Amino acid sequence: MEKRTDYCGNITEKYIGQDVNLYGWVQRVRNLGNLVFIDLRDREGLVQIVVNKDSGKDLMEIANSLGNEYVIQVRGKVVKRSEANPDMKTGQVEVDATEIIILNEAKNPPFEIKDGVEISEQTRLKYRYLDLRRPEVQKAIILRSKILRATHEFFDENGFIDIETPILGKSSPEGARDYLVPSRIYPGSFYALPQSPQLFKQLLMGAGFDKYYQLARCFRDEDLRGDRQPEFTQIDMEMSFADEQTIQDYTEGLLKKIMKDVMGIDLKTPIKRMSWTDSMNKYGCDKPDTRYGMLIHDLSSIFKDSDFKVFSGAIADGGFVKGIAVKNGAKEYSRKKIDKKADFIKRFHAKGLAWVKFEDGEFSGPVARFLTDENKEALKKEFDLEGGELVVFVADKWKVVCDSLDHLRREFAKETGIIPKGVYDFVWVVDWPLFEYDEGLGRWVAAHHPFTMPDDEGVKLLTTDPHKAHARSYDIVMNGDEMGGGSIRIHKRSIQEDMFKALGFTKKRAYEQFGYLMDAFDMGFPPHAGLAIGLDRFAMMLAGKDNIRDVLAFPKNASASEPMMHAPAPVADQQLADLGIEVEKQYEDSVKATEERLEKMAAEDAEENSTWDK
């Protein structure tokens, strides 16, 4: 095929007077009788093609035959428009066509190929190859590609080695559920797809590759949310002979390059740091949104002797009274609206939501009658009340208070419009606890993972009081979302064994699962550290999207299925037999129904669209 002169969206005034050869999709055709306008689209944008009566009968007939999404080749001369379109990059010019070649026709698509149209997720994913033609979708995918390019350039410039680690590995019951791959050669045995390359990259440090990175594909069989997919990509790095500061410096360098190359923003470094304890106490969570204020205040000292027993009773039971002040919230929030907030935080086990309003120098609301003059003055000073504020309180155990006020703070910020737009605010959260209590499992688990090095005091506490130990770990947070996390890793057998003991491992279990790692520690293993950034979530936020699916070319839906190829799907009985797998009877009807549904859909598609027998 003849070489394209340039992309449609790049045909600007510099091409005036030149003959060009373009390829693209027909976005729209406007027939004015003796004049036909064609909007030709490719990934860079639109350019207007003009065909008139002077172009000849054959060319006019071809132009009139075009439909939306036809794929065409256009030859012509670039001329200045008589009336410019300031809303288009190519709005100063148009192409006076001399030849149009139809490369492929198109049926009417199930939705318009343009931005701003309402399309169900199911339809978008079923016809993803059409959805991907839309400019806003392409823009997000291209942004992701720019992040990848900047990442490779940064690590290459800084002496890191790109090393691929295995996709087929061994299952570990820690963390989320694994995706399992049955082995035909070893019936009854399974590979697991990696949840992360954690142990492989640590072993690479033991092998002497002191600066590793990888754009690592990871897989987790977990419940999906807007910011999760069953398969995802990590920007993964590991270094030998590195401490926290070294890893953070390199991470900041990477983020600085990405923000500049992709967004045109000069990221100021060093990025501020905040302890995990401060983050929890001031923001209610370990991923603080630092773009706005509305911080959480501990009011326990003010209310420890209060006549309001909800407050004083919670404090006497070892709990806390904390609150936030919502500027201009007094008029914005009715009792009905506040009651809805109270109902919502019950999911965090909060028993209720107390509140007062401060207007014209006076407090009002359900709690106001319990406030002494001393309480009132203390609240005014604590929150720097000026008038018009709504102050909400939660009195309960520390974790309940944190979870509840974290949610309320985020909701109030969205609803009152105080979150600045176009701001990317990063913060390091450091000095984490080594363990956290999992209410669902009813036991202590590693706050990050079992290979995290405790701090010096924590090493001693591992064998005496491990749940008081702190970790040498760090998370990078942007706009209230965890972008990534890392830590100094354990590199000695004795510490790793103590860590497993603290997590309730038996010796047998520890060595069956991780004996190879502890053996490696005895072979001259260097101190090492690393970090991983969630690429998909990072791209989603930079693209201004609410769902990770918008920055993936072919994502799964909220049910972890893919409507276009119909994955997952049943497989042939012989394939199962080769693997020594038999579907349990309770699932046979479901499998049969799925097979019949897919066969019917394929038959209908063939009947309606196929040219097989024509």
Swiss-Prot record:
Primary localization: cytoplasm
GO cellular component term of the entry, any: cytoplasm
Catalytically driven reaction(s): tRNA(Asp) + L-aspartate + ATP = L-aspartyl-tRNA(Asp) + AMP + diphosphate
GO MF term list: aspartate-tRNA ligase activity; ATP binding; catalytic activity, acting on a protein; nucleic acid binding; transferase activity
Coiled coil ranges: none
Annotated disulfide bonds: none
Record-linked PROSITE patterns: AA_TRNA_LIGASE_II
Record's keyword annotation contains Metal-binding: no
Subcellular location: Cytoplasm
Binding site for L-aspartate: E174, R220, H448, R489
Subunit structure: Homodimer.
Functional note: Catalyzes the attachment of L-aspartate to tRNA(Asp) in a two-step reaction: L-aspartate is first activated by ATP to form Asp-AMP and then transferred to the acceptor end of tRNA(Asp).
Protein family per UniProt: Belongs to the class-II aminoacyl-tRNA synthetase family. Type 1 subfamily.
NCBIfam families: aspS_bact (TIGR00459), PRK00476.1 (NF001750)
Listed name of the protein: Aspartate--tRNA ligase
Biological classification of the source: Bacteria, Bacillati, Bacillota, Bacilli, Lactobacillales
